[in-house]
UniProtKB/Swiss-Prot annotation:
Keywords associated with the record: Developmental protein, Differentiation, Nucleus, RNA-binding, Spermatogenesis
PANTHER family found in the cross-reference section: ADENOSINE DEAMINASE DOMAIN-CONTAINING PROTEIN 1, EUKARYOTE SPECIFIC DSRNA BINDING PROTEIN
Chain ranges of the A to I editase domain: 291-617
Disordered, as annotated region: 28-47
Residue ranges occupied by any DRBM domain in the UniProt entry: 138-206
Molecular functions per Gene Ontology: double-stranded RNA adenosine deaminase activity; double-stranded RNA binding; RNA binding; tRNA-specific adenosine deaminase activity
Phylogenetic classification of the source organism: Eukaryota, Metazoa, Chordata, Craniata, Vertebrata
Family matches, as Gene3D superfamilies: 3.30.160.20
This protein's encoding gene: Adad1
Name this polypeptide is given: Adenosine deaminase domain-containing protein 1
Amino acid sequence: MATAGGSRRAPVPGPRLGLPLAAHLPASLGGEGAKDSLGGEKTSGNNDWFQSSRVPSFAQMLKKNLPVQSSAQTVTLPTGYSSESCSLSNMASKVTQVTGNFPEPLLSKGLSSISNPVLPPKKIPKEFIMKYRRGEINPVSALHQFAQMQRVQLDLKETVTTGNVMGPYFAFCAVVDGIQYKTGLGQNKKESRSNAAKLALDELLQLDEPEPRALEPAGPPPIPAEPIVTPEAAYISKVQYEGRQVQYAKISQLVKETFSQLISSHSQYLKCSSSLAAFIIERGGHHEVVAIGTGEYNYSQCIKPNGRVLHDTHAVVTARRSLLRYFYRQLLLFYSKNPAMMEKSIFCTEPASNLLTLKQNINLYLYMNQLPKGSAQIKSQLRLNPHSISAFEANEELSLHVAVEGKIYLTVYCSADGVNRVNSMSSSDKLTRWEVLGVQGALLSHFIQPVYISSILVGDGNCNDTRGLEIAINQRVDDALTSKLPMFYLVNRPHISLVPTAYPLQINLDHKSLSLNWAQGDNSLEIVDGLSGKITESSPFKSGLSMASRLCKAAMLSRFNLLAKEAKTDDLLEARTYHAAKCLSGPYQEAKALLKAYLQQHGYGSWIVKSPCIEQFSM
């Protein structure tokens, strides 16, 4: 990973490499005024409050608020969750309807975190520093969280490389409270932004300076220094890439072996493997498949408000709901109070937090045998030839989509009748949502911190590259949104890679509406008819006479109530309905509202909300 040292107070030159997509699009796509991630005007580059001579300097406040490295005392997290000083109704009043004219370029430029001149800076929790050091928070998201806690303005600006750096490198630098930090280089913008954020954080958090340095005498500014990109560094990067690809290929093979074993007695469902999706847990270098799903359809009949119908049976959605069942089992292990069983759980406590978190060195992978429906299947010419695209085409490809009986439509065309028929958002859009809110959902957010996907692996059976998936997941939502999200939430950036496909793609005419699901601990597969949302007669697993799937909302509420009893959180049991239990998860609901507002204000369309009566049931 190439980085560079530079002057902290040098002027920031204009961009040299990699013009943004907005530079090639019609003027109608960009809009006149630059907006922040919630639709307001961007603030200026300087923060007058922090520059005032009557208040402490940023460096003084930072030194005061950083935890003392040598002290063993516990630093508590803030008791409340930060929120913007605007109501949801105010957000709605600023929403721009999708008309083909976007209020901002589709691939958003870096947005500045807005400093607050009224509220005092927060203390930097030791847990935040530890998580960053362990690599659990990517540098860009961590820097935005830091800026939010310190109430300072942040901007990641593209700059230039000097003549002694050979090759097509991009350069970015972080500007925090008007101070420019060292320049980060990379072979793409994502890598260079990450390197720049890391350089700034390492200095701001004093990670490279265990002992404070004496103040240096005033003098001329230091000479900027760019890194020397050596052949050895390039070789190490290549070795790391090849090693990672070998690991990913083994994961794909592991998924194939697991699914083949599950259907060994049900070979008639082999063709369902074309849509296969699976979640894999890595623990201490060992990988195990913990959740599997297949399917390409969703429920399309009339609303049934009993919670016993499965609405979306697309593979990645089914696999994720199976993953939730795995999480519930792991949490029951933790709350068993049996030391041996607690040791087996993937969850553990974290100091100064009442929410559990994944144990150290545990990572979550997602394998998909094919690209998910929606924006991830963006046309290659749209992303490779920006000069030739039209505003309408860009709008259509990158906007939010809704799934209806296996087909994909723009949400802007979704009628009121469509909403009553229980349509679901596309799998691509749900992946985008999980990369901000986590995969755990609202109910489990009462017990655990957000769980994010570390890597997404896509089978190469019908996919030549993953750029469409990169855009759908990693570029529709800007890192700056992290600074507005509640504690523990962030804009996650999973690594996306092509891997050898686990199964070849096959046309499945006989069982095209069927969906298979399994989670670690299940004795057998469950088979659901995606069109009816119920278990089939031929399913190896059956729940009872109602034929309700073990993945339905009612089943999840039953597990939630059981977990609440084991965790002795009696207040959660007071929720009278499934909907009420979800609404009690305040930080999760706040993050969800911010994400929906962000997507709508940036021209991607409205997130379709199902009828409220679907969740108004109780056990």
